[in-house]
Regions:
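Basic, helix-initiating cap at the start of DNA-binding domains
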Residues: 1-24, 28, 33
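HTH DNA-binding helix-turn interface
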Residues: 2-4, 22-26, 39-40, 46-57
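Alpha-helical structural segments
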Residues: 11-19, 23, 37, 54-73, ...
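Append "Primarily bacterial transcriptional regulators
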Residues: 32-37, 45, 88
Protein backbone atom coordinates (compact mmCIF):
# COMPACT_ATOMS: atom_id res chain seq x y z
CA UNK A 1 0.00 0.00 0.00
CA UNK A 2 1.28 3.43 -0.86
CA UNK A 3 1.85 6.03 1.82
CA UNK A 4 -0.94 8.11 0.28
CA UNK A 5 -3.36 5.15 0.49
CA UNK A 6 -2.31 4.49 4.06
CA UNK A 7 -2.92 8.12 5.00
CA UNK A 8 -6.35 8.05 3.34
CA UNK A 9 -7.39 5.04 5.42
CA UNK A 10 -5.90 6.55 8.58
CA UNK A 11 -7.90 9.72 7.94
CA UNK A 12 -11.08 7.74 7.26
CA UNK A 13 -10.68 5.81 10.52
CA UNK A 14 -9.92 9.04 12.38
CA UNK A 15 -13.05 10.76 11.09
CA UNK A 16 -15.11 7.74 12.12
CA UNK A 17 -13.69 7.77 15.64
CA UNK A 18 -14.26 11.51 15.92
CA UNK A 19 -17.91 11.20 14.90
CA UNK A 20 -18.52 8.28 17.25
CA UNK A 21 -16.78 10.00 20.17
CA UNK A 22 -19.19 12.92 19.98
CA UNK A 23 -22.07 10.47 20.59
CA UNK A 24 -20.53 8.21 23.26
CA UNK A 25 -17.47 7.92 25.49
CA UNK A 26 -14.38 6.58 23.76
CA UNK A 27 -14.19 3.73 26.28
CA UNK A 28 -17.49 2.36 24.94
CA UNK A 29 -16.63 2.63 21.25
CA UNK A 30 -15.66 -0.67 19.65
CA UNK A 31 -13.29 -1.28 16.77
CA UNK A 32 -16.24 -2.77 14.90
CA UNK A 33 -18.17 0.49 15.24
CA UNK A 34 -15.17 2.44 13.93
CA UNK A 35 -14.64 0.12 10.97
CA UNK A 36 -18.35 -0.10 10.12
CA UNK A 37 -18.60 3.69 10.06
CA UNK A 38 -15.42 3.93 7.96
CA UNK A 39 -16.58 1.20 5.58
CA UNK A 40 -13.52 -0.99 6.09
CA UNK A 41 -12.98 -4.40 7.65
CA UNK A 42 -11.46 -4.98 11.09
CA UNK A 43 -8.16 -6.37 9.77
CA UNK A 44 -7.66 -3.07 7.92
CA UNK A 45 -7.91 -1.22 11.22
CA UNK A 46 -5.32 -3.50 12.82
CA UNK A 47 -2.98 -3.06 9.83
CA UNK A 48 -2.89 0.64 10.74
CA UNK A 49 -3.36 0.85 14.52
CA UNK A 50 -3.03 -1.44 17.54
CA UNK A 51 -6.15 -0.07 19.21
CA UNK A 52 -8.46 2.95 19.34
CA UNK A 53 -6.11 4.76 21.69
CA UNK A 54 -3.29 4.59 19.17
CA UNK A 55 -5.73 6.02 16.62
CA UNK A 56 -6.58 8.81 19.08
CA UNK A 57 -2.86 9.51 19.52
CA UNK A 58 -2.48 9.64 15.71
CA UNK A 59 -5.32 12.19 15.49
CA UNK A 60 -3.71 14.44 18.10
CA UNK A 61 -0.27 14.15 16.55
CA UNK A 62 -1.51 14.70 12.98
CA UNK A 63 -4.05 17.45 13.60
CA UNK A 64 -2.52 19.37 16.49
CA UNK A 65 1.20 18.69 16.87
CA UNK A 66 2.68 18.14 13.41
CA UNK A 67 1.30 21.39 11.93
CA UNK A 68 3.10 23.45 14.60
CA UNK A 69 6.38 21.54 14.62
CA UNK A 70 8.19 24.16 12.47
CA UNK A 71 7.00 26.92 14.80
CA UNK A 72 8.29 25.08 17.86
CA UNK A 73 11.61 24.37 16.15
CA UNK A 74 11.96 28.10 15.47
CA UNK A 75 11.19 29.05 19.06
CA UNK A 76 7.71 30.38 18.27
CA UNK A 77 6.07 28.56 21.17
CA UNK A 78 3.36 31.19 21.76
CA UNK A 79 2.17 30.99 18.16
CA UNK A 80 2.26 27.18 18.26
CA UNK A 81 0.11 27.10 21.39
CA UNK A 82 -2.41 29.50 19.85
CA UNK A 83 -2.77 27.20 16.83
CA UNK A 84 -3.04 24.09 19.02
CA UNK A 85 -5.73 25.64 21.22
CA UNK A 86 -7.60 26.92 18.15
CA UNK A 87 -7.62 23.36 16.80
CA UNK A 88 -8.98 22.04 20.07
CA UNK A 89 -11.63 24.77 20.16
CA UNK A 90 -12.65 23.99 16.57
CA UNK A 91 -13.40 20.39 17.55
CA UNK A 92 -14.16 20.88 21.22
CA UNK A 93 -16.95 18.29 21.27
CA UNK A 94 -14.50 15.61 20.17
CA UNK A 95 -11.58 16.66 22.37
CA UNK A 96 -13.79 17.13 25.43
CA UNK A 97 -15.26 13.65 25.14
CA UNK A 98 -12.05 11.95 24.01
CA UNK A 99 -10.21 12.89 27.19
Amino acid sequence: MTNQGRNAIDTLLAESLKELTIKQPIEKITIKEITDKAGVIRPTFYNHFQDKYELLEWIIRTELLEPVKPLIQNGMIDQALIIIFAGIEKEKDFYTKAS
